[in-house]
Amino acid sequence: MLISKVKRYLGQATCVAFVTIALTACGESEPQTGGAPPDMRRLTVEQYRNVVHDVFGEHIEIASRFEPLIRTDGLFAVGASNALITPSGFEKFYNVARSVAGQVVDEDNRAVLVPCAPVDMARADDACSRQFFAEVGRYLYRRPLSESEMETAVSAANEVADQFDDFYAGIEFGLTGLLVTPSFLFIIDETEADSSSSSGLRLTGYAKAARLSFLLWNSAPDDMLLKAAAAGDLHTDKGVERQVERMIQSHLLARGVRAFFEDFLDLEKFETLEKDTIIYPAYTINAANSAKEQLLRTIVDHTVNQDAPYPEIFTTRSTFIDAQLGRIYRVPVTRPDGGWEAYEFPEDDVRAGILTQMGFLSLFSHPGRSSATLRGKAVRELLLCQKVPDPPGDVDFSLFNDPDAPSRTARERLTAHSTVPSCAGCHKLTDPIGLGFEQFDGIGQFRVAEQGAMIDVSGNLDGNEFGDAKSLAQAMHDSPSVPACLTNQLYSYAAGRAPERDEREFVRYLESEFAESGYSLKVLLRDIATSDAFYAVTQPKNKTEDVRAASLNSKTKQERGS
């Protein structure tokens, strides 16, 4: 009964509109860009969770997983712009929506989460339903509901309430419907005419608010940002700057920064990380979770709490550990409960920066041994934005796994690649970097020997020779490619796409401003969020066809759930 009504509700939902971003003059030195056509991005699991928790509270449980996004141009945020919802994917969204709505109207929660009480709990209450959907819908849709959207939600809720003699059953049904519409599941670039823009279009104030909030807080706009959008403040430089400054000062910025680095560093891989526990008995799922958390805590503390230079995340000795990591690093944990505490590695310790933490070292290793190739490839691709080609399909790996020489070290094994022309080119890019981490095994435990031989951890990073992991960390700190890569990927993350050709000059401008600030991540975020480029859009290449395609695509996404 309920699912058939939700299908009918979806059929009545308003088709998703296109969005565009307006050009508003920011600074004379900022290069102007044309932007890109309006787009729509599917919420990530974390964004979905954040929005629901911000609206209804963190006690609302979201247990199910959604269809995975495809990592595109090095980011899931870019892949979200190409995401569709399959029939099985819709069922997952529907099941989660129904669970969330049920928790909202539960007897333990309704008094707090439903802003009014019905005159009669056994009947529909039009006024109370309207109040609920107006308040909740404004946050879920990141804008006020249209009159048709309101009528659809209220009518559906009233019908179910009267049918089941239960006002809250109607609210549950109507809320379930809101949570499976494209207007909630997708961040949509809605546009309006703007004669002052070269494209003739600009993002609506609400679309600008959504861009800001998902970049800085990884969630929907709060009340103050929505009010600024309604008042037209986000169409002025000062209005945008005022909101950006407020949001950067908020504790929620840490959540937004965590989300970016989780995507940037491909930490999603932790969900499928496996290790041979016979070889590594210290490895557990809890240790892996702590390793991921340590990476993110270190980065957020350094770049947000301390506002320290970004390149120093590769050399800092300050971090956080818990009992799980204490065993891996062989350092004492002072808290009786084994919880998180600040820790600083001594000057004579080989560990320095995030690349010598368990998180990076275990993530880019094989289940039963370390991998200089995987680690070097991760440094090249994730942190330097340099593509390493995949190995040829006809490589005979038996050449490098000689059963008559099982005791060879990693360096000796990898040297064999230099004798095979089809392998040598790529391995020369990765192995001289990754060998610098060979004093750390497949889960990041320190060692000085492998197969009875002392480990040689010397190497080379783009012409800069190093003798150990600490000097490799310093080479990363000093590399101009490191901040350039971060700048490019942060802008791609913010825009949901790789920079357009005419935006390259703007990205170089961001790099220059980033350097001028002493590599402050907060300044880089502020420069992006207050720029013209972040909101600039062009007309679709073929406006009529693109708009029709958008409507059909939206309709298809709705009908796939039927």
Name each model-derived stretch.
Residues 148, 187, 200-209, 213-259, ...:
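Extended, well-ordered alpha-helical scaffold/bundle regions in very large, multi-domain proteins
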Residues 69, 78-134, 438-487:
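Short, functional "switch" segments adjacent to catalytic/cofactor/reactive centers
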Residues 2-15:
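Bacterial N-terminal signal peptides that target proteins for export
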Residues 168, 326, 342-469, 473-477, ...:
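Sequence context surrounding c-type heme c attachment/ligation sites in exported
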Residues 23-25:
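C-terminal motif of bacterial Sec signal peptides marking the signal peptidase cleavage site
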Residues 226, 239-378, 388-389, 562:
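A cross-family structural signal marking well-folded subdomains
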Residues 123-174, 182, 195:
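A conserved hydrophobic secondary-structure block that centers on an alpha-helix together
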Residues 27-29:
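Bacterial signal peptide processing site
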